[in-house]
């Protein structure tokens, strides 16, 4: 009986964490959700990916609004594998897998009127967390800082972000 109760509690915890992650995604501002969606599209396009991934949590968010509906976004976040297979349509029942490492993603892009611009090309870099080195993290940030999104002194990472 105790084993059944333990199993029930663990199952409820897994489902709750999946629901919390979906809630975290839905609470992201729209311009950040679009970036997460872009990263997920690129991730599932790889043939080696077998599971569906969901947004797990933000590590760093930064944006610059220049006016005239133009903005620049930098977002560093985690994706987490679920027990659902790649291509699952209804992801509301997908429970997180704890046997797979998180995927650490960094993305930067220009928006106009709330949409991601094709030029300059959005930068998306996602890698399993254990494989991500400090040099790679530095390279990501440097790449986003040097992207020629705008003229002037402001850069994507010059704004004060929120964690």
Task: Write out the residue ranges for each language-model feature.
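Short amphipathic alpha-helical molecular recognition features
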Residues: 24-32, 65, 69, 118
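N-terminal signal peptide
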Residues: 11-30
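Short, non-transmembrane alpha-helical segments in secretory-pathway proteins
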Residues: 25-52
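Beta-strand/loop motifs with alternating small/hydrophobic and polar/acidic residues, enriched
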Residues: 2-3, 38-42, 46, 57-66
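Compact beta-sheet-dominated globular domain cores
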Residues: 85-163
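Classical eukaryotic N-terminal signal peptides for Sec-dependent ER targeting/secretion
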Residues: 1-10
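Short, flexible/disordered secondary-structure transition segments
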Residues: 8, 46-54, 91
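Exposed beta-strand-loop-beta-strand "reactive/processing" segments of non-cytosolic proteins
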Residues: 53-93, 104
């Amino acid at each position: 009986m105790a084993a059944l109760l333990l199993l029930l509690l663990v199952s409820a915890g897994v489902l709750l964490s999946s629901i919390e992650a979906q809630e975290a995604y839905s609470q992201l501002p729209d311009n950040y959700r679009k970036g997460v969606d872009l990263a997920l599209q690129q991730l599932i396009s790889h043939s080696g990916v077998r599971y569906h991934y969901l947004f797990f949590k933000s590590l760093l968010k930064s944006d610059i609004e220049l006016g005239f509906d133009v903005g620049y976004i930098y977002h560093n976040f985690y994706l987490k594998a679920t027990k659902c297979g790649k291509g699952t349509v209804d992801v509301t029942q997908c429970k997180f897998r704890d046997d797979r490492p998180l995927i650490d993603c960094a993305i930067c892009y220009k928006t106009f009127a709330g949409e991601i611009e094709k030029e300059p090309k959005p930068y998306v870099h996602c890698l399993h967390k254990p494989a991500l080195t400090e040099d790679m993290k530095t390279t990501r940030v440097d790449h986003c800082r040097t992207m020629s999104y705008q003229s002037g002194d402001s850069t994507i990472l010059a704004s004060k972000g929120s964690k």
